[in-house]
């Protein structure tokens, strides 16, 4: 049996996936089944755009269900070990870009729960890779997408 990719995530991220799966199974799936039923009542399925759209939607929902079930089955819950001296998945890191004093904070999470707009970056991102394993007051070079880099100083880990 081949090794399954594990999906590191916080307990919060795991619970969010479970909620999303529950909604897909108990709300979205029955809704699309009803849409298909209604579209079938229109008759000829060969030229029935409502039926085609509902079947497409059903396919997307089933695909999402399979993807989330796979992630839940292969989830690796990251427990907080209480060590706020080292950056790791689940921790929120505050740093300043050098030179300067403006602070930025991000929580490092598994790719399944990453959301930059909510300040959650994937452990697979270049920034997180550069920060993981580093400690308080460490200066770190973070690679940028344009090929450059920025220097940051870690000022808080929680």
From Swiss-Prot:
Residues 2-70 form a coiled coil. Keywords: Coiled coil, DNA-binding, Transcription, Transcription regulation. Pfam families: GreA_GreB, GreA_GreB_N. PROSITE patterns: GREAB_1 (PS00829), GREAB_2 (PS00830). InterPro entries: GreA/GreB_C_sf (IPR036953), TF_GreA/GreB_CS (IPR018151), Tscrpt_elong_fac_GreA (IPR006359), Tscrpt_elong_fac_GreA/B (IPR028624), Tscrpt_elong_fac_GreA/B_C (IPR001437), Tscrpt_elong_fac_GreA/B_fam (IPR023459), Tscrpt_elong_fac_GreA/B_N (IPR022691), Tscrpt_elong_fac_GreA/B_N_sf (IPR036805). It comes from the Bacteria. Disulfide bonds: none annotated. One of its GO terms (molecular function) is RNA polymerase binding. The keyword GTP-binding does not apply. One of its GO terms (biological process) is DNA-templated transcription elongation. Necessary for efficient RNA polymerase transcription elongation past template-encoded arresting sites. The arresting sites in DNA have the property of trapping a certain fraction of elongating RNA polymerases that pass through, resulting in locked ternary complexes. Cleavage of the nascent transcript by cleavage factors such as GreA or GreB allows the resumption of elongation from the new 3'terminus. GreA releases sequences of 2 to 3 nucleotides. Belongs to the GreA/GreB family. This is Transcription elongation factor GreA.
């Amino acid at each position: 049996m081949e090794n399954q990719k594990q999906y590191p995530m916080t307990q919060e991220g795991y619970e969010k996936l479970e909620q999303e799966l529950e909604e897909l199974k108990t709300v979205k799936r029955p809704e699309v089944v009803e849409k298909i039923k209604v579209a079938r009542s229109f008759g000829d399925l060969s030229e029935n755009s409502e039926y085609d759209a509902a079947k497409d939607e059903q396919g997307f929902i089933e695909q999402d269900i399979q993807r989330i079930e796979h992630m839940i089955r292969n989830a690796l819950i990251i427990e907080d070990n209480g060590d706020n001296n080292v950056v790791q998945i689940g921790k929120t890191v505050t740093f300043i870009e050098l030179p300067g004093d403006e602070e930025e904070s991000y929580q490092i999470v598994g790719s399944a729960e990453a959301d930059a707009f909510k300040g959650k970056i994937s452990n697979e991102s270049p920034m997180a890779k550069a920060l993981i394993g580093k400690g308080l007051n460490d200066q770190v070079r973070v690679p940028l997408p344009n090929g450059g880099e920025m220097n940051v100083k870690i000022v808080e880990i929680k």
